[in-house]
Amino acid sequence: MANTVIIGAQWGDEGKGKIVDMLSAQSRAIVRFQGGNNAGHTIKVQGEETILHLIPSGILHADKMCLIGNGVVLDPHVFLEEVDHLAAKGVDVSAARLGISKKAHLIMPYHKSLDKAREAKRASHKIGTTGRGIGPCYEDKAARVGLRAGDLANPDLVRAKVAHALQEKNTLLRDLYKFDPLDEAAVCQELLALAPRLLPYLTEVEDHIQKIQAQGGDILFEGAQGIHLDIDHGTYPFVTSSNTVSGNASAGCGVGPSALHRVVGIVKAYTTRVGSGPFPTEQLDDTGSYLRTQGHEFGATTGRPRRCGWLDAVVLRESVRLCGMTDIALTKLDVLQNLPGLRICVAYEYEGHKLDYMPQEEGALEKVTPVYEDLPGFEEDITGCTRFDDLPETVRAYIARIEELVGVKVSMVSVGAERRQTIVR
């Protein structure tokens, strides 16, 4: 038995959905353990593209159990929209194979309103939130006033919690942010109207995981966003509102850390970032535009154009340290075709010193100068390669250099969007 954690090793959008979809074939269950519908995982099978924001990417495999853990914040509307979308495509989304932890917190309308109001008030100092209420929902969780999925079975409890929440939220919306307050009865009615459809999906996720492990089945833990968006270890304050590191797979679905055997870091062959925040290797020239165009770098959730730049080995070394990555899945390697040369950032210059690690002080990463190592580019079309030895020598050299700089083996190489366009070493 080998349970596997999948995490993004950069700032998100590394191609986790495709790798989760592929590894799901070897697993009994796939579990989301953090984040919400601010993540967008894209899977392409036989030319058909599916984008999922909440439901685990393994749902496209008919015989797999898919679970949403307690560490996820769940928008009931988005969950049901995904259920309906998948059902219309013939995917089995019955409660027999899809479950939500009763401990998962629910994103409420006032969370979304607060998210948008705060971002609007920040003006030129925006964090880059998706406005989907993720942060405010996690705030209520930490303040011990949030609604959990299991509360839906008790309408009186729902009404009491909404009434308590709106005393504060409406004051903030109306008086501080100059936004319209929300109607208590309407909020309750909207949520309780969804309860009959949601309640069958509520379950004890920990119990499912324990039973599958007892039977010798493998579990795939699916992370969202990327390591450097982690609330504690990311480029604060330009981070998400949850822990995205591999260790949170344990807390986010209720299993002991000894159940986590393998950690696969998903690494894009270049680097991208959405929204604000430091990005040492960002390219604002034709190279950045080429990567964005060739890589179709627009957010699956927001549609926003992604910032693009060269691969940063300093960032990846930090990812290995934080998450204990056992191996790497290198994605979007085909996007680099036809660039005259390739560059990898191997160190930073900062205040007269050369650093091989990320400085921790807030704002410091914005002041570093990347130190690059240049490698030859390639013109060959690699999208049809099915074995590692089929790749051009220059491509194999690029991969080997990444392994040397990071200290972790590249076990998978993605050379196209399709499930089949993946080389396993």
Swiss-Prot record:
Subcellular location: Cytoplasm
EC number: 6.3.4.4
Cofactor notes: Binds 1 Mg(2+) ion per subunit.
One protein family per Pfam: Adenylsucc_synt
Residues that hold substrate according to the record: A300, T301, T302, G303, R304, P305, R306
Amino-acid positions noted as binding IMP in the UniProt annotation, renumbered to this chain: D13, E14, G15, K16, N38, A39, G40, H41, T130, R144, Q225, T240, R304
GO molecular function: adenylosuccinate synthase activity; GTP binding; magnesium ion binding
GO BP, sorted A to Z: 'de novo' AMP biosynthetic process; IMP metabolic process
Cellular component, GO, one term: cytoplasm
Residue numbers binding Mg(2+): D13, G40
SUPFAM superfamilies named in the record: P-loop containing nucleoside triphosphate hydrolases
Cofactor field: Mg(2+)
Highest taxon listed in the record's lineage: Bacteria
Leading EC class: ligase
Active site, UniProt feature: D13 (proton acceptor), H41 (proton donor)
Reaction(s) catalysed by this chain's protein: IMP + L-aspartate + GTP = N(6)-(1,2-dicarboxyethyl)-AMP + GDP + phosphate + 2 H(+)
Alphabetical UniProt keywords: Cytoplasm, GTP-binding, Ligase, Magnesium, Metal-binding, Nucleotide-binding, Purine biosynthesis
S-S bridge residues: none
Pathway: Purine metabolism; AMP biosynthesis via de novo pathway; AMP from IMP: step 1/2
PANTHER family assigned: ADENYLOSUCCINATE SYNTHETASE
Binding partners and assembly: Homodimer.
Family: Belongs to the adenylosuccinate synthetase family.
Name under which the protein is recorded: Adenylosuccinate synthetase
Phylogenetic classification of the source organism: Bacteria, Pseudomonadati, Thermodesulfobacteriota, Desulfovibrionia, Desulfovibrionales
